[in-house]
Amino acid sequence: MAGAPGLGSAFAVRVWLLLLLCVAMPAGAEPERVTVGSYLRNVEAIDLDQNAYHVSAVLWFKWKGERDPTKSLRFVNLLEAWALTQVPVYEEPLTLPDGSRYQRLLVEGRFFHKFALGTFPLDWQKVMLELEDTQRGAEQLVFELDPSSGVVPELSVPGWVVKAPIVEEKRVEVPGSFGLAGKLEHSRVRFGVLLQRPLRVLFTTMLPPILLVLMCCWFVFFLKPVHVEARVGTVITALLTIVFLQLAFTDDLPYLGSTVLLDQLFNLSYVVITAILFECVTVTRLFDKAQTLEAKLAALVETEKVKAEAELVMVRGRVESLDARSRRWFPVVYLLGCALIIFFARGPEVFSIPL
């Protein structure tokens, strides 16, 4: 029985160690919170075909843990890893008066975001940086947004109007958890800016050539039906010109498998030009019929001559009436169709798009 006291001491030590472990590893521990901010300095080389752009920005991080989150940082939408410049401002993170750590990164590189081009050329696009931690999930690390994030006041992007900055944080679930058991989520932050294409791109660059071609088509209604070659030739030339304009204006767009707003305007132009060609053919046939009736008048007897003259007057009246109505209604129908296409594509917000 001499060994009993030693046995009790060993058991007591084990109990104390177990209690210490329970205190050191509490269940449901809170994830580390890292404050992230961004200051967008420049956006350039926007490539619609590749859904890419070049961004220069300053990122800063504040945290209280021992691990440096900038070491495991990953840009989710990085396009060219070899061209990424990610330079820390300080060799070692600073220690702030409140005990938290601080590091700042100068970031420059080429990134991507899938552009929504359905309303081109009245579209708006997001230019963003997306970043997350590669080693710790949302149960271990959560990014918090710094409210002082923004863009440089003098930021200018040729061909675009700079709108509101983008500052977002969201949880992204990883399907399959990369082969691990359980659910895997990452805290992801987005920094960027919203760019709006101004109205002048459509109304001063693209629509004027289209309207000029349609106006040339409209002039055929002022030509007499006897000039059939000029009427039909003008319409066919206008149709070919519209085709070339569409190819030129949409050359920088990637293949989408669907039509954009500009394509719909061109499709309306094709319909109107085809209708004008149909009108020219109809008028030409009526004019030929009138010419035939006029040639037969001399050989007809008096009773038949009166009937033929009445028919001739009716045919000539139809020709003049058809041209007159076409002169009046074709411009109205085309302009109204363009307005409806633009309105249905952007809705009431089209009136708030900057010039």
Where are these regions (language model features)?
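N-terminal secretory signal peptides that target proteins for export/translocation
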Residues: 1-12
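Juxtamembrane amphipathic/hinge helix adjacent to a transmembrane helix
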Residues: 185-192, 243, 303-312
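Channel- or pocket-lining gating/hinge segments that regulate access to a cavity or pore
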Residues: 190-296, 314, 318-327
